[in-house]
Amino acid sequence: QQPVVFYIDTLIQDSWVKAIQKSADEWNIIFEDLGIGKPIIIKPYEKDSTFRANNPMINTIAFLNNNNSEVTAYNVTDLRTGEILSSKIGVPRDLAVSVRRNGVYQMAEIDPRFRTYYIADEVICENLTARMLKAFGLSLGLATNLAGSAAYSPEELRSPEFTQKYGITASVMDNVLYNYLAQPGDKEKGVVLIVDKPGVCDAFTLKYLYAATSENESDTLKKWAMEHDGDPRYFYGKRSPAYATDPRCQNYDLGNDPIASLDAQIAHVKYVVKNSPAWFHDDNIPNDYRELFPDFVIIELINKTLSPVSSYIGGIYINEANEKSNVPSYQPVSADMQKKVLQKIFSTFYDLSWLDSNKDFLRLGGVNPDMSTWIYNNGYPMMSLMFRLMRMGLSVEKSTRPYTQEAYLNDIEKQLFKETLNGKPLSAPMIAQLSVYISSLKGMCPTLKAIDKAVSTRVTSIALNEQTNHKLQSLGLLTTFASISATEKQSGMEPMTSVNFYSGTDIEAICYDKLKSTRRYLIQARSLASNDIERGKCDYLIAMIDRVI
């Protein structure tokens, strides 16, 4: 047994060195429990003239004096054996940029220390400790485990006793930092708000990798693994392929309840929209930060709230096959859960008026239009929903009571025309989403795509003139439609990097039927329009369909 010595750059300030040491100490606690002692040792760069930080045979923690704002880590390995020869970890000069960008949106409502541009060094050190936990884990041979953050319930993650004992994730090798399921007042109760220690899965992995075993090592390791069979805390989640998305293995997710997770994140962003202008009135704050701040809200909404929750639609839980395991290899997300998620996405993302409610917030970015309109006109959330439609095939195939593509589109259609069914004109958000919906349905039908292309090249149509058609622009319709399309087959040669053995389900007939039913609903919606502009919008959407059917 040899110690793992890391040489740390003397340019790193003392408070950060202590934060890094704290991270190493947390890993050493697990090693001590295994009877191995404290193998991770941190020393300053040696002053000896022969010392070289770029020596591939020594472990280093370097100060990165560049524009990067994330902790980086990679291993130098022996390609013949896979042995880790050394680890190279980088601590960025601009770590505060990353803390400020991600922490404010997720934690400002819970932790007042994030309600400012000037993030305190104490907060940065907490973040550095959290990030170094994963970096050290990588150096010890642990792989990214995207399922770690999905192991615990929202109730557990709001419990002071639970979070102080177990942390906020079963594995720090996941891509999660903050306990955004916490609510105002939880910090004062003692709820842990940031990753602060390795999880139970990490502890087990160290035992599996480093603990002494009997002579029959293989049987011992299998026995240890089977002791936790079916326990979500010990599930190792790889990045899943697009055609078989495991919703437990998503970036930025937290907790085992996607609805509660979405509600918590939306509440935090609402708080930021309402209160953030008061945090950034100092003239010394860089203008580029203020100007981009509202745009980060859109990124937060789409990448960190919409994407993880939408993965449950057509999602499938994938477990490693084992002859002794009672856990099925493939278990589709239940139809009820998929329907709940779809309904939640509509109820959440089709009322974004709160995004535009604070004009001071919008003015942070200069002369900003309504942000909700920008989101709708760029195809969200319909783009995400139609993307999931193309990934439902395997889930439907493996389920005994599937949520089929046809049922999914029926539910989307009911939501899109909810106003029409209640005798009301279509709202602007629904008009924008319908254009994406129609374009995506056409894009998933190779025959209709061919017809649409032929019509476009044969006649001077609306599509050819929409870039300069001021009448269309005055109607508030998209001039360049966002859509989801099936991949076109083209001739040619390119390097083959992977082989995909899965062939998607042919849903062309279903999409064609939905276009026809959408047309019928649009005719009904047109009759409910209160003015010529609304009727013009309906006419344009009907024309989109008539081009191909």
How would you describe each model-predicted region?
Residues 1, 14-139, 143, 167-168, ...:
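Metzincin-family zinc-dependent endopeptidase catalytic domain
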Residues 4-9:
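Short, well-ordered beta-strand elements
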Residues 146:
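Acidic, metal/ion-coordinating pockets
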Residues 149-549:
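Conserved catalytic/binding loops enriched for acidic/polar residues
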